[in-house]
């Protein structure tokens, strides 16, 4: 099947300045992500960045770059600029791979593209089971609940669904009902164009989760359980050291 991967790579980062270019065993992190995306079988892989140093690193690795503005408020807004600059048709399948996921399996990049292509929906994403209470109650682990057809009902930083009877007795054992959302999305290009015309929603501001804008406006997001669990993403210096050890 035909799809395009876009990797937003914003240079500024509060916790890890210059994050796309941090060295992981001899390569900039963004190059590791680029290589994983290429392995997915995508027709094109484009790195969207606002910084010349990132562009140079990607081009040195033979990658394609689209320079974007620095003032985007979200990764989806950056994607929309790339969609317009590249002139993608509305039915083009776009997969958004985060630029700080050097251990993302190529298989799940393709999985989200295939899931979207098989459905009449504008957006698709993935999740993985949560097995430990610490993760279920961690606000940095976004949870998702779905309907019977696999469409998202809600995303939250809270522990959803709340297991009333189980948690009344103990919050140390969580059962098998929790799913952690992965930050990988598939879209049709036309859906991205529509998304950026919508005003941010109140729920989006409360939870700080941009995908809630989609549900607020009555659109569907398909969610599937990922075929493989991705490795550690890089948000902090501690994450970086962990990834360096795992990729050694």
UniProtKB/Swiss-Prot annotation:
Classification via CDD domains: CMP-KDO-Synthetase
Listed GO CC annotations: cytosol
Key word Cytoplasm present: yes
Keyword vocabulary terms for this entry: Cytoplasm, Lipopolysaccharide biosynthesis, Nucleotidyltransferase, Transferase
Predominant location category: cytoplasm
EC number(s) per entry: 2.7.7.38
Enzyme class: transferase
InterPro entries the UniProt entry points to: Cytidylyl_trans, KdsB, Nucleotide-diphossugar_trans
Keyword Cytoplasm found: yes
GO biological processes: CMP-keto-3-deoxy-D-manno-octulosonic acid biosynthetic process; lipopolysaccharide biosynthetic process
Superkingdom in the source lineage: Bacteria
One Pfam family here: CTP_transf_3
Pathway stated in the Swiss-Prot or TrEMBL entry: Nucleotide-sugar biosynthesis; CMP-3-deoxy-D-manno-octulosonate biosynthesis; CMP-3-deoxy-D-manno-octulosonate from 3-deoxy-D-manno-octulosonate and CTP: step 1/1; Bacterial outer membrane biogenesis; lipopolysaccharide biosynthesis
Compartments in which it is found: Cytoplasm
Catalytic activity reported: 3-deoxy-alpha-D-manno-oct-2-ulosonate + CTP = CMP-3-deoxy-beta-D-manno-octulosonate + diphosphate
Example of a GO MF term: 3-deoxy-manno-octulosonate cytidylyltransferase activity
Family designation: Belongs to the KdsB family.
NCBIfam families on file: kdsB, PRK05450.1-3, PRK05450.1-5, PRK13368.1
PANTHER family linked: 3-DEOXY-MANNO-OCTULOSONATE CYTIDYLYLTRANSFERASE, 3-DEOXY-MANNO-OCTULOSONATE CYTIDYLYLTRANSFERASE, MITOCHONDRIAL
Function: Activates KDO (a required 8-carbon sugar) for incorporation into bacterial lipopolysaccharide in Gram-negative bacteria.
HAMAP family: KdsB
UniProt protein name: 3-deoxy-manno-octulosonate cytidylyltransferase
């Amino acid at each position: 099947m035909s799809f395009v991967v876009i990797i937003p790579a914003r240079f500024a980062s509060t916790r890890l300045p210059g994050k796309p270019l941090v060295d992981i065993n001899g390569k900039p992190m963004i190059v590791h992500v680029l290589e994983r995306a290429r392995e997915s079988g995508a027709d094109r892989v484009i790195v969207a960045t606002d910084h010349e140093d990132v562009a140079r690193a990607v081009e040195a690795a033979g990658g394609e770059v689209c320079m974007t503005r620095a003032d985007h408020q979200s990764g989806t807004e950056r994607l929309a600029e790339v969609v317009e600059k590249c002139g993608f048709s509305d039915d083009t399948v776009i997969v958004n791979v985060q630029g700080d996921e050097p251990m993302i399996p190529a298989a799940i990049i393709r999985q989200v593209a295939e899931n979207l292509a098989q459905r009449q929906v504008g957006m698709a994403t993935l999740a993985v089971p949560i097995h430990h209470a610490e993760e279920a109650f961690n606000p940095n682990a976004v949870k998702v609940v779905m309907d019977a057809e696999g469409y998202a009902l809600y995303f939250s930083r809270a522990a959803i669904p709340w297991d009333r009877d189980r948690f009344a007795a103990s919050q140390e054992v969580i059962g098998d009902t929790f799913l952690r959302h992965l930050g990988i999305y598939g879209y049709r290009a036309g859906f991205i164009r529509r998304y950026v015309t919508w005003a941010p929603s109140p729920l989006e501001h409360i939870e700080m989760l941009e995908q809630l804008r989609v549900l607020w406006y009555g659109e569907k997001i398909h969610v599937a359980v990922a075929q493989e669990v991705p490795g550690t993403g890089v948000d902090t210096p501690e994450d970086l050291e962990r990834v360096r050890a795992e990729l050694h």
